[in-house]
Swiss-Prot record:
Entry similarity comment: Belongs to the universal ribosomal protein uL11 family.
Protein task: Forms part of the ribosomal stalk which helps the ribosome interact with GTP-bound translation factors.
Keyword Ribonucleoprotein appears in the UniProt entry: yes
Name this protein carries in UniProt: Large ribosomal subunit protein uL11
GO molecular function, one term: large ribosomal subunit rRNA binding
A GO cellular-component term linked to this record: cytosolic large ribosomal subunit
Length: 142
């Protein structure tokens, strides 16, 4: 028989930087999970990632206080900011431009994010990336 799931916990943790301090420690501790076990496992799995890359993680919590976790790809905004070489998006998207991304960069981001997006074709994934870029105040060229 499968373990009984008692809940899910979604966190965004920098790659290789999981530690028991807030926000990770309190979020796991109040659910009775072993904080250090998660930190060691997460850091081991994110060793190959670039340091401080934000990694969304979904932790499945079971009734016996054990857990499993699934890592997603970094947020689209992270990839867009890297491609445009900016620190943050525009405060007034649509009016002020924060930077530019090319169609090739959009395609590359769509290919990286494809497994986490709810679409079938690369073209629809590219449209999602372009929409995110526009909402950040980035112009898509090409």
């Amino acid at each position: 028989m499968a373990k009984k799931v008692t809940g899910y916990l979604k966190l965004q943790v920098p790659a290789g930087a999981a530690n028991p301090s807030p926000p990770i420690g309190p979020a796991l501790g109040q659910r009775g999970l072993n904080i250090m076990e998660f930190c060691k496992a997460f850091n081991a799995q994110t060793q190959k990632e670039e340091k401080n890359t934000p990694i969304p993680v979904v932790i499945t919590i079971y009734a016996d206080r054990s857990f499993t976790f699934e890592m997603k790809t970094p947020p689209m905004s992270f990839f867009l900011k890297q491609a445009a070489k900016i620190q943050s998006g525009s405060k007034l998207p649509g009016r002020d431009s924060a930077g530019k991304v090319t169609s090739a960069q959009v395609r590359e981001i769509a290919e990286k994010k494809m497994k986490d997006l709810n679409c079938d074709s690369i073209e629809s994934a590219m449209r999602m990336v372009e929409g995110s870029a526009r909402s950040m105040g980035l112009q898509v060229e090409g």
